[in-house]
Regions:
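Glycine-rich phosphate-binding loops that contact phosphosugars or nucleotide phosphates
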Residues: 261-337
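Conserved short alpha-helical segments that host acidic/polar catalytic motifs at enzyme active sites
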Residues: 1-221, 229-264
C-alpha cells in the first residue's frame, strides 16, 4: 500500500529522504503511529529505531505545557522535544565542520546538532534518531545510543541504515557511528561529532558482502533460502577452522586455555535463529566437555537476575553483531560480575 500511495503522487522532487519500519512497541500499528513522525508545526520529520523508556513521563510534561499529540508513539515525543530545542539553540551551539554545508543549510545543520544533543540528554533507553527539516531538506542529522547506525559512502550520495544491508547494493564503503555520537549527512559529505561536541575523523571500512546474499536467489522466501543454505554455511564455517590433524582450531577465541578449563557453567544467549544455534551448541558442549549449558533468549535474560558466578562463561550469539537485546544482555551479564 505504501508503494502504491507514494507512486500515485508522481516523481518526488527531493534529494534526501528518511523512512523506517517500526515494530508497534508504542501504540497500535496504524497510519498515525507510522514513521516518520512530524513536529506539530511540520518543520521536522523524524524516524526512530529503539525504545524511549521515559516517553510517558516526557509526554505528560509536554501535555501539561500545552502540547497536543497525534499519535501514541514514543517517537512523536522526541520530535516535539526536538522542535522546542531547535528554537532554544543558535548556530553557535556547534562551531565545527558540518558536512561541507554553507549558507542556510549550514545554519540549520548547526542548530539541529545542538538540538539533537540537548534532546538525547533527556532520553532514557535505546535509540537511533534521524531528522530532516523543511528549512534545509538536503541535510539529515542523526544520533544513536545503544542502537546501531551505519553510514554508507557513495559517489555523490550517502546512506544511513541500521545495517550495511540497507545500502550494500549501492556501495561497499561504510562508516560505523559510535555511542552517543551525532552525525550530519549531505549528499557529498559526512561529519561525525563526539558527545563532547568535537568532530572526529571518519573510521571507514570496506564491507565484504555481496548484494547477492541479500536476494532470494529464486526461492519463494528468505526462510526457505536460508534453510537450504545451512549445509554449505556450516561447511564454509568449519573449512578454515580445522587444522592439519583434523582438530578444531578456534583462533578467534582469545581466552587463555587455563581460563576456559576453569569454566563450570556456560550460558548461551541469542535471539531467533541465533538462539537455535545455541541449542545445538548445548548438545555438543555438554556431550564433549561435560559442562552444564543454559540457553536463553536475550530479551528474557536481560530482565531477570541470573546466577552468574566467577567461573560462568556467557556466550552471546548474533548474526549481525548488532542485535540490541543481545547487546543489552551482555551488559547485564557483565554487571552481574
Amino acid at each position: 500500500n505504501l508503494i502504491e500511495e507514494v507512486d500515485a503522487d508522481g516523481p518526488i522532487d527531493a534529494i534526501a529522504g528518511i523512512g523506517h519500519t517500526r515494530w508497534a512497541t508504542h501504540g497500535r500499528p496504524t497510519v498515525a503511529n507510522a514513521h516518520p513522525q512530524m513536529s506539530p508545526d511540520g518543520r521536522f520529520a523524524l524516524v526512530h529505531n529503539g525504545i524511549i523508556e521515559n516517553a510517558d513521563i516526557l509526554r505528560a510534561a509536554l501535555i501539561a505545557d500545552g502540547e497536543a499529540f497525534a499519535s501514541e508513539t514514543d517517537t512523536e515525543v522526541v520530535v516535539h522535544l526536538l522542535a522546542r530545542a531547535y528554537d532554544d539553540v543558535t548556530p553557535a551551539s556547534y562551531l565545527g565542520p558540518v558536512a561541507g554545508l554553507t549558507g542556510a543549510d549550514e545554519e540549520v545543520a548547526r542548530r539541529l546538532v545542538g538540538a539533537m544533543r540537548a534532546v538525547t540528554e533527556q532520553l532514557h533507553g535505546t535509540f537511533t534518531l534521524l531528522v530532516v527539516s523543511n528549512q534545509s531538506p538536503n541535510v539529515i542529522v542523526a544520533a544513536r545510543r545503544s542502537s546501531p547506525l551505519v553510514i554508507g559512502l557513495g559517489e555523490g550520495e550517502n546512506f544511513l541504515g541500521s545495517d550495511v544491508l540497507a545500502f550494500v547494493e549501492h556501495t561497499n564503503r561504510a562508516v560505523e557511528i559510535g555511542q552517543d555520537q551525532v552525525v550530519v549527512v549531505s549528499a557529498t559529505d559526512v561529519t561525525v561529532i563526539d558527545p563532547d561536541g568535537s568532530p572526529v575523523a571518519l573510521k571507514e571500512y570496506e564491507v565484504d558482502f555481496s548484494s547477492d546474499r541479500a536476494t532470494k536467489n529464486g526461492w519463494p522466501t528468505f526462510m526457505e533460502k536460508e534453510i537450504h543454505e545451512q549445509p554449505d554455511a556450516v561447511g564454509a564455517t568449519l573449512a578454515d577452522r580445522i587444522d592439519s590433524h583434523g582438530r578444531l582450531a578456534l583462533d578467534e577465541v582469545r581466552i587463555p586455555e587455563s581460563v576456559l578449563r576453569s569454566v563450570d557453567k556456560v550460558i548461551m544467549i541469542g535471539c531467533g535463529t541465533a538462539s537455535y544455534a545455541g541449542q545445538v551448541a548445548r548438545y555438543a558442549i555438554e556431550h564433549w566437555c561435560r559442562i552444564p549449558v543454559e540457553v536463553e533468549l536475550s530479551s528474557e535474560f536481560r530482565y531477570r537476575d541470573p546466577v552468574v558466578g566467577e567461573k560462568t562463561l556467557v556466550v552471546a550469539i548474533s548474526q549481525s553483531g548488532e542485535t540490541m537485546d543481545t547487546i543489552q544482555a551482555i551488559r547485564h551479564a557483565r554487571e552481574q560480575g
